[in-house]
């Protein structure tokens, strides 16, 4: 199978991960949340530069829990603010920023490395892994070319399913 041979090259083309250095501060989701956070801080008497507010949100991106309340508590300890429900609502959007930034760098990686998922893989039987979860004897039900991912399901006729990185599947047929 040609796709199996191609996939053995995956150790040469590593999927990028988000790091503080790779954050696009011009990302629309990032800018929107920073704007809201800056407005919230300034309403409470804050007077820092925009870069300071951006750095606070970047710190939140790399916390293990993206729950707005937990991030508000983190910022309370980190930058000495007094959070309220409005801040919690603002910080609830951090997971959206994370997903947007990650999709942005992965999309760039896909373009730079000319990665394509063949359209004929839909319907093929695969085993897949995602973190500690394994999906055995599943079918590819869809393709997400912009992020080099596929959806897999145990039902071949299902639309959608679990989203798995293409390099983490093994063809069975």
Enumerate the language-model features and the residues they cover.
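N-terminal intrinsically disordered, low-complexity, charge/repeat-rich segments that act as generic
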Residues: 2-84
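Mixed-charge, Lys/Arg-rich low-complexity intrinsically disordered regions
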Residues: 85-122
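Intrinsically disordered, low-complexity, charged/polar segments
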Residues: 100-115, 155-173
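Basic/aromatic-rich interaction segments and small domains that mediate binding to polyanionic partners
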Residues: 129-166
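Short interaction-hotspot residues at assembly and binding interfaces
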Residues: 78-93, 143-145
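Short intrinsically disordered terminal tails
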Residues: 1-4, 117-121, 170-173
């Amino acid at each position: 199978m040609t796709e199996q041979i191609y996939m053995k090259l995956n150790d040469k083309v590593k999927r990028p991960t988000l790091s503080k250095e790779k954050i696009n501060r011009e990302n629309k989701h990032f800018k929107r949340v920073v704007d809201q956070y800056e407005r919230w801080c300034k309403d409470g008497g804050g007077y820092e530069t925009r870069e300071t507010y951006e750095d606070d949100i970047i710190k939140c991106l790399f916390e293990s829990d993206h729950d707005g309340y937990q991030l508000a508590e983190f910022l309370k300890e980190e930058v000495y603010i007094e959070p309220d429900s409005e801040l919690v609502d603002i910080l609830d959007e951090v997971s959206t920023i994370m997903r947007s930034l990650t999709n942005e760098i992965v999309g760039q990686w896909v373009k730079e490395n000319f990665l394509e998922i063949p359209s004929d893989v839909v319907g093929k039987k695969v085993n897949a892994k995602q973190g500690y979860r394994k999906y055995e004897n599943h079918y590819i039900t869809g393709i997400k070319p912009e992020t080099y991912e596929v959806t897999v399901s145990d039902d071949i006729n299902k639309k959608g399913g679990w989203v798995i990185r293409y390099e983490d599947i093994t063809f069975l047929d």
